[in-house]
Amino acid sequence: IILRPKPVGTLVHDALLPGKRLWFFATGTGFAPFASLLREPQTYEDYDEIIITHTCREVGELAYGAELIEGLKSDELLAEVIGEGFWKKIKYYPTTTREQSPKMGRITDLMRSGEAFADLGTGPLDPATDRAMICGNLAFNLELKEMLESYGLEEGANSDPKQYVVEKAFLD
């Protein structure tokens, strides 16, 4: 295993300007890159609040994300590095689109209606304070990218940090 001293790719902290609230938007297996970011002390040091949205067709597809977030509560290494209760900064917002669950609907639809913001106790994303990372299927990424830009957020890169970034690797 070769470990690099610094993370690379599009979903990295260096591609975002400083902010107060970090949003992770995922569909299906798009949750995976956020697993490492949720274990990264910098995530909790840089943001007052971390909101994770995970939209899947079926309830079972949400299990990985839910288990990971629950496991953070007992992560002794993060607690030692960041401090006890670091996980209280996290708000997890799982939704399904086909199978019945406590929260039904695509996150983009729930944002458009204002329901997601009401549920989470926030307003729409604000470019002065909110930062976002997007990882999902291509159609979702494009739709959410358009939505974030309608809120005034701009896409960033490692060489030009802004308010949001999108995963660019896709499998055929």
Predicted features along the sequence, with ranges:
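Ser/Thr-glycine-rich phosphate-binding loops at phosphate-binding pockets of nucleotides
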Residues: 27-32
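Conserved S-adenosyl-L-methionine
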Residues: 19, 43-50
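Reductase modules of NAD(P)H-dependent flavoproteins
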Residues: 53, 60-172
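FAD-binding FR-type
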Residues: 1-23, 165-172
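Extended, folded domain segments that form the structural surfaces/walls around functional sites
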Residues: 35, 52-54
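Glycine-rich helix-loop-beta junction characteristic of Rossmann-like nucleotide cofactor-binding loops
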Residues: 13-16, 43, 122-125
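Conserved beta-strand elements of the Class I
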Residues: 22-25, 133
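Histidine-anchored nucleotide/phosphate-binding helix
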Residues: 33-45
